[in-house]
From Swiss-Prot:
It comes from Paenibacillus polymyxa. Cleaves arabinose units from O-2- or O-3-monosubstituted xylose residues, thereby assisting in arabinoxylan (AX) and short-chain arabinoxylo-oligosaccharide (AXOS) degradation. Preferres wheat flour xylan over oat spelt xylan as substrate. Does not display endoxylanase activity. This is Arabinoxylan arabinofuranohydrolase. Belongs to the glycosyl hydrolase 43 family. Pathway: Glycan degradation; xylan degradation. Substrate binds at residue 311. Pfam families: CBM_6, Glyco_hydro_43. Residues 1-26 form the signal peptide. The gene is xynD. It catalyses: Hydrolysis of terminal non-reducing alpha-L-arabinofuranoside residues in alpha-L-arabinosides. Activated by calcium and magnesium. Inhibited by copper.
Amino acid sequence: MIRKCLVLFLSFALLLSVFPMLNVDAANRPLAKIPGNSNPLMDHKLGADPYSLVYDGRVYIFMSSDTYVYNKDGSIKENDFSALDRIQVISSTDMVNWTDHGTIPVAGANNKNSGRGIAKWASNSWAPAVAHKKINGRDKFFLYFANGGAGIGVLTADTPIGPWTDPLGKALVTHSTPGMAGVTWLFDPAVLVDDDGTGYLYSGGGIPNESDPASIANPKTARVIKLGADMTSVIGSATTIDAPYLFEDSGIHKYNGKYYYSYCINFAGTHPQQYPAGEIGYMVSDNPMGPFTYKGHFLKNPYTFFGVGGNNHHAVFNFKNEWYVVYHAQTVSKAQIGAGKGYRSPHINKLVHKEDGSISEVQGNMTGIAQLSNMNPYTRVEAETIAWQAGVTTEPTQASGGPISNLNVTNIHNGDWIAVGKADFGSAGAKTFKANVATNVGGNIEVRLDSETGPLVGSLKVPSTGGMQTWREVETTINNATGVHNIYLVFTGSGSGNLLNLDAWQFTPNTGGNTITKVEAENMKIGGTYAGKISAPFDGVALYANADYVSYSQYFANSTHNISVRGASSNAGTAKVDLVIGGVTVGSFNFTGKTPTVQTLSNITHATGDQEIKLALTSDDGTWDAYVDFIEFSL
């Protein structure tokens, strides 16, 4: 997973030359992901050793937490991998617009992650692998990670983005695990859940003796071991995978009933032509435990495509009936400092299986994958959903109404911008644009089409909200936004500091009616002793006892609304859910029976401004549970 890359020392003056002073009359330029391209997947942060998880129409990419490390003079060091104690997560439905889900603070030994580390025994979290499996009818997610080269740990969650817990309190696999002796580097996990629900964990790497040609040619340090039904235990002994010229980076996928084990070929010694150094080779078997037979290679070293090399790390996945490979390359760091220095970023390109089962050579490039579907601008869009950007970063937020591990866009200066690809405004077009913002000084958000200097269709004045985590929804009118366009939000304002933070945004359609605001229960704050997420009869939240609730903050310009909630009871009884706005109970929803229904409370009056909306139990008699799907109303 970790190899040294080209060392290039930069002076502080040169570093500053890469970041010229902003011309306040012009928008900033993107760093590495250029509008129209899909690679790298993001350039506002780094991410290495990518692994994919496809779930519920989204692809999630989990990555090691590459972070710039600095010399005393302010120049960027060569990556020493000391910051790999967290896991980065992003996701997308269309392969262009990626939502930043922040970091998972995995390693917890020696007060790592400021004491928030989940695995208190682990000092590192390298090269994640992720799997989904239904256990006892419930969706469960499993995050495997390497504690350096000493073993593999596992975390579990009920959603792909957490919250994550450590079910074991120790490593799942170590050198003491049967069959794991002799593995030089016990890291770089990959995981397969087969069609029958059985899980398999692949790992390993390294050359036992780099001065021995036989050891270089057949390191025999890759392993596969069967997982227990709970995915957090192992069964039996690990089996050796005799991958020729193995270096690291286990990968696994299944295609047409065959099992494909793939890996990074090592750099040591002299290789026969069929084992090119630093490329991704692959083997095929009829059994997930092997034996595997070497068939060839399909992904060249990143240097071939981008002029900056280093190790090769990949994962193969199928998304919406097409095959892809995600891999890392040092393209963002090259764009920022002129050299990779070992700092990596995720890329995706298409992968093709030929009729005979062999894999075609993948063409790595900055173009990437064309957007798979248009975006709907009339639903809430998290601001950290970004196709392209200039100047911004993201941070954890206190704003409500977003997903678990919600972020906001920050570090916003005059001329910075964010953009999303291919939003479909329809023939009627947009009427208004609203955004959830927080700011001390205020500023403006220009809404432009197709470029940062494209047609201006609206301008949103952002007043001071009284704090950078004091949130308020503001709105403006939109003109001449119809059809399919890329949307650019360009930030303007005075001063040299952070102008504002942006949590989410949404357009309203120009149909003559009011916009519909819909908030999913599973994205709200969950409170009470027993409340928890459910996946049946819908993805939502179960309220099991009095004082259980879900809530979020909503800005109201008007004081009267019709408010609808979709819900159900756990049985034939009637589940009563109170609607509380601003601390005042304004009505109740009564859901009878297990079939979900939408109920509406009409002409509800309440206070204006920022108000807490809460759906709560106060009259539970112990004979029923309430299931809540979403709340919906017209602004």
